Curated annotation (Swiss-Prot):
GO terms for cellular component: nucleotide-excision repair factor 1 complex; nucleus. Involved in nucleotide excision repair. Binds specifically to damaged DNA. Required for the incision step. Residues 32-42 have a biased composition (Basic and acidic residues). Disulfide bonds: none annotated. A zinc finger (unnamed) spans 191-216. This is DNA repair protein RAD14. Its main location: nucleus.
Length: 371
């Protein structure tokens, strides 16, 4: 734009603002905001490094003219700017590159997450040799500085102290083996059935807390047989909340024999289940009475279901009979033809023999051709 066009544009802008001010459309705050918005941009120092540089930047900022050829308004605030920067205080509204560079990079949130695009980052992967050799297994105060040297020396063996190894072996022994034998055989616990054998069945002893040997557990299946959860519910009429209560019954869990994805199989010892069932139903007689009551209930429900089916069939038959009667009243009774013996009807134009039959009731005549 030429200087004449700029001057004309500025004059028109001032006239428009004056006209709006006279009409009372614009307030004083709005006028000040418009004036500050239309002022030329003020240059400011890019960075503050030292006292001499700040003075040079301030001096350079004083002599920068605006686009109208007039001195910038920043020259009027030279002293304020110099004192502000000289004191080392940076205004929060002014962006300082030196301050921004000092921000910690770990707090800056990336715009793109790497895990959304990279599933396997080979730069961060570690070679564990199929899971058999882990460099992290070495001790912190180990003499090996290189992981390859550690792997070549120990291989898949985890480096540990003698105390750690003894502690681990003791834990494995307590977990997978029975308790050590007593000091004297007379003090050893004996089987509660035979009172002779001191070697207990590990499953009954460790899981169900019963001092029974293997021979006695096989000779008395009516006491020490293992029952599934379904058998407990069907034979002793126990509910799921009762069987799931760990305070009432000991249980042995195994993988489901039907499928590995099914719920785990739970086994209960018969003597515990019987004792709780007798207490619940009032002894063996009460359990038999409950079984008889449930069998009678099953028979009653079966008979009730049969009667319901018979009733539905009768209603259906009655409705069909009623429909047939309405059809007979409207269209008459359905006629069934009774044809007479065939009579020779001659030969047709194609040379085939024709036989005629006639209904004895309505006189309907049909022709049959023997091909």
């Amino acid at each position: 734009m030429t200087p004449e066009q700029k001057a004309k544009l500025e004059a028109n802008r001032k006239l428009a603002i004056e006209r709006l001010r006279k009409r009372g459309i614009l307030s004083s705050d709005q006028l000040n905001r418009i004036e500050s918005r239309n002022e030329p941009l003020k240059t400011r120092p890019l960075a503050v490094t030292s006292g001499s540089n700040r003075d040079d930047n301030a001096a350079a900022a004083v002599h920068v003219p605006n686009h109208n050829g007039q001195p910038s308004a920043l020259a009027n605030t030279n002293t304020n700017t110099t004192s502000l920067y000289g004191s080392g205080v940076v205004d929060g509204s002014k962006r300082d590159a030196s301050v921004l560079d000092k921000r910690p990079t770990d707090r800056i949130r990336p715009s793109i997450r790497k895990q959304d695009y990279i599933e396997y980052d080979f730069a961060t992967m570690q070679n564990l040799n199929g899971g058999y050799i882990n460099p992290k297994d070495k001790l912190p105060n180990s003499d090996f500085t290189d992981d390859q040297e550690f792997e070549s020396e120990f291989g898949s063996k985890k480096q540990k102290t003698l105390q750690d190894w003894k502690k681990e072996q003791l834990e494995r022994k307590m977990l997978y083996e029975n308790a050590p034998p007593p000091e004297h055989i007379s003090k050893a616990p004996k089987c509660i059935e035979c009172h002779i054998n001191i070697e207990m069945d590990p499953v009954l002893h460790d899981v169900f807390k019963l001092q029974v040997c293997k021979q006695c557990s096989k000779e008395h299946p009516e006491k020490y047989a293992l029952l599934t959860k379904t058998e407990c519910k069907e034979d002793y009429f126990l509910t799921d909340p009762e069987l799931n209560d760990e305070d009432l019954f000991h249980r042995l869990e195994k993988p489901n024999p039907h499928s590995g994805t099914f719920a785990r199989m739970q086994l209960f010892v018969r003597c515990e289940v019987e004792a709780f069932a007798f207490k619940k139903w009032g002894g063996e007689e009460g359990l038999d009475e409950e079984w008889q009551r449930r069998e009678e209930g099953k028979a009653h429900r079966r008979e009730k279901k049969y009667e319901k089916k018979i009733k539905e069939m009768r209603l259906k038959t009655r409705a069909q009979e009623y429909t047939n009667r309405l059809r007979e009243k409207k269209h008459g009774k359905a006629h069934i033809h009774h044809f007479s013996d065939p009579v020779d009807g001659g030969i047709d134009e194609d040379g085939y023999q024709i036989q005629r039959r006639r209904c004895t009731d309505c006189g309907l005549e049909t022709e049959e051709i023997d091909i």
